[in-house]
Amino acid sequence: MPDEFNLKSFLADLPHLPGVYRHLDAAGEVMYVGKARDLKKRVSSYFQKTLASPRIAQMVSKVVRLEVTVTRSEAEALILENNLIKSLRPRYNILFRDDKSYPYLLITAHEWPRIAYYRGSTSKRGQYFGPYPNSWAVRETIQILQKVFRLRTCEDTVFANRSRPCLLYQIGRCSGPCVQAIDAEDYRRDVQRAARFLNGEAREVMDEIEARMQQASGELRFEEAAVLRDQMGSLSKVLHQQTMENVGGEDTDVIAVASAGGKVCVNLAMVRGGRHLGDKPFFPSHADGEEAAQVQEAFIAQHYADNVLPPVLVCSHALPDVDLIGLLSEQAGTRCRVLTRPQGVRRSWLEQAQKNAEMALARALTESGARAARTLSLAEALDLDTDEAALDALRIECFDISHTAGEATQASCVVFLHHDMQPSLYRRYNIVGITPGDDYAAMRQVLTRRFAKVTDGEAPMPGLVLIDGGKGQVEVARQVFVELGLDIGALVGVAKGEGRKVGLETLVFADARAPLALGKASAALMLIAQVRDEAHRFAITGMRAKRAKTRNVSRLEEIEGVGAKRRQRLLARFGGLSGVTSASIEDLASVDGISMDLAERIYDALH
């Protein structure tokens, strides 16, 4: 280690306090972040003669500096550790993708509540059910509630402005509260039953509906009895189609780990209100060679730092850190217990989660092998490095220009890395200051903006740069690279073939190599076509959104007397410009701040 850092002295001065430690390499990069109840004991353990694994030994051999942060408690250390892992993404930590928040099913607090798919903070008023493992599970549940309880799903602005019921009412999926086709008390009762159903009281709800049906029939209220009979029939079908288990009403997450072929899968299954909502596989980075229990623990620590901790966790492996669940419970303000040898239905859940983990891993390995084979084919065709590490690190960027008659010109850049597209790295560039429709000038501008950052050391240089175009576009790209002092050998144009058919493209090079036609059967060309088509799709969607936004906003802005606040009220009331356009003069005048005279001007301007 360098003279300026004295390891022996550093370890001697460490306190017996909780905190977070960081291992740094010669370049000052953080290689690993960990937490400790006792910093002195934990950090010192890394420098003993025997270490837990060869991977840890390899990391320790590269450590040239240590940093620690003392915290007030181990729970605080856990929070800091997770924040640092997410922001720094150290290469020796097991990393799980920072997934977007899980979806919920929301029953709103409206006078006539609606059921809705919801993602975000749960601090707003309403009843939240979930979280669900994916959007499909939420939407399936909404369909069940529509069939059984006929609750509305329309936006409040649409609900407030309906004069006749929609198609969902006609097909028996909504009771029509927008036109008072159902009594307020009956609708409220249906909402309560739906909430109880979601909380796992399906059998009790069924019994209640049956009792009310018998009562209505006995009192000769046959129409009401028929509605309740149909509701009971729909609920009965749901109960036969789905497994509803009575497990004391405790929400449960089931976690199973499978490993093979150098990859690991952590499968998370969710059970809410006795209903198995499905599962979701996670594939961590930097987990090769790690014990399954360590991977599971890393998942739990990272996942439940940001997501709801359920009362019960059913796990395929015991946790090495016995204090972890206590820390997460303290952070969440709720108690949680871990079961590693479950019985009864929970055992079947774990067995199913384990099978699904193994199946997801097998699919991922098959897909990964196929993707790697395509990358290898491309590298061989273009004479690039073909060793495994180089192929995994091969970064391909593709640029495309999109506009309509010169309006809303945008350039797109999509990125292929680790044998797959990387949407989080995509970028759009608004093109300005050029003659409308000049694609060459647009390409020059986007390439200059992107690759000037490479020469400044602010961005990585791709191994391959694809240009959607032929000789003209490639020549523009070559000029930009020469001006910036970059290797023109990385530039490849994708010239469209006859009839723009996939498989007939020709590759055009900037370094005087002869054009290359790989042919329809080439896996390399299929990969190039995929990246090129993704760049085109990304550019088109961005251009359309930009053009639509400009046109929609400008139409209202051009109307005298419609300022920002009135425009906002109109769009909110009618759910967008199309709603404003279809509104009558009387409807427009009902909006706060819109007089009858102004409503007529708005109507005339939009028609």
UniProtKB/Swiss-Prot annotation:
According to the record's subunit comment, the protein's assembly and interactions are: Interacts with UvrB in an incision complex.
| Key word DNA damage present | yes
Location comes to:
Cytoplasm
What protein name applies here?
Answer: UvrABC system protein C
Q: Which organism is it from?
A: Bordetella avium (strain 197N)
Q: Give a GO biological-process term.
A: SOS response
Q: What is its main location?
A: cytoplasm
Q: Which family does it belong to?
A: Belongs to the UvrC family.
Q: Which SUPFAM superfamilies match?
A: C-terminal UvrC-binding domain of UvrB, GIY-YIG endonuclease, RuvA domain 2-like
PANTHER family, per the entry: UVRABC SYSTEM PROTEIN C, UVRC/OXIDOREDUCTASE
The residues covered by the GIY-YIG domain are 16-94
GO terms for CC? cytoplasm; excinuclease repair complex
What does the UniProt keyword field contain?
Cytoplasm, DNA damage, DNA excision, DNA repair, Excision nuclease, SOS response
Question: What GO molecular function annotations does the UniProt record carry, in alphabetical order?
Answer: DNA binding; excinuclease ABC activity
As recorded in Swiss-Prot or TrEMBL, the protein's gene is named uvrC
Task: Describe its function.
Answer: The UvrABC repair system catalyzes the recognition and processing of DNA lesions. UvrC both incises the 5' and 3' sides of the lesion. The N-terminal half is responsible for the 3' incision and the C-terminal half is responsible for the 5' incision.
Instruction: List residues traversing the bilayer.
Output: none
